[in-house]
Amino acid sequence: AIGERYEGILKAACDVIARRGFHQASIREIARAAGLSLAGLYHYVGGKDELLFLVLDRSLDRLIDELDLALAEARTPELRLLALIRTHLGFGFRHAAALKIINRDWELVSGPRRDEISAKRQSYLTRGLAVLREIDPHGRSGDELLSATNLLLGMLNGIATRPFLRSPEDARTLAAEVGALFLYGFLEATPRSTDLQAADIRRP
């Protein structure tokens, strides 16, 4: 029961902070969304700063774990790129509020805890960088690959929210389209995105 209550508090905090913004979200509003009195909320957490950290910490752990699992199952560099894209878009579909907070509010975490969140964000970025390095046929520099990784993740952040994603199938279709665009370029003749989807389905 305590664990369920705690999860409910974090979900309420995530929803309120994503909708209102960290500075505009009040601890009283979060308590109300969690079905608690203000005193009841403080029984579980120390305040809004702690809630922001906990939401970010858990959300990033979930995102990284999902990516690691997807990458482990992908058998080729191309499928690992598709796994990265699909994981990010799928996370955005299932946890849109969390992804918004990860991208918008993480720098508002105070003190040493911000370093913890920054390290987890960097860990995720490093995984994306490794995917692009593996697939790069031109021996690009580290700076070029980092720019490409940031470009890819920025594009995914831009579309990983409704109304672009209305279903898991939307996430799968968009992932194939983004993968084709990123792999083959806009001006090149490209395999159809449906071919990438089929390749993903056929993977051993």
For every predicted segment, state its role.
Residues 58-68, 91, 111-137, 146-150, ...:
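Amphipathic alpha-helical packing segments from all-alpha helical-bundle domains
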Residues 93-112, 161:
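Amphipathic alpha-helical segments used for helix-helix packing
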Residues 8, 12, 16-50, 54:
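Helix-turn-helix
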Residues 5, 9-17, 88, 156, ...:
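Short hydrophobic clusters on alpha-helical segments that form packing/core surfaces
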Residues 55, 59, 190-191:
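Alpha-helical bundle regulatory/interaction domains
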Residues 67-70, 74, 102-106, 159, ...:
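Secondary-structure edge/capping motif, primarily at the C-terminal ends of alpha-helices
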Residues 54, 68-97, 148-152, 175:
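Hydrophobic alpha-helical connector segments
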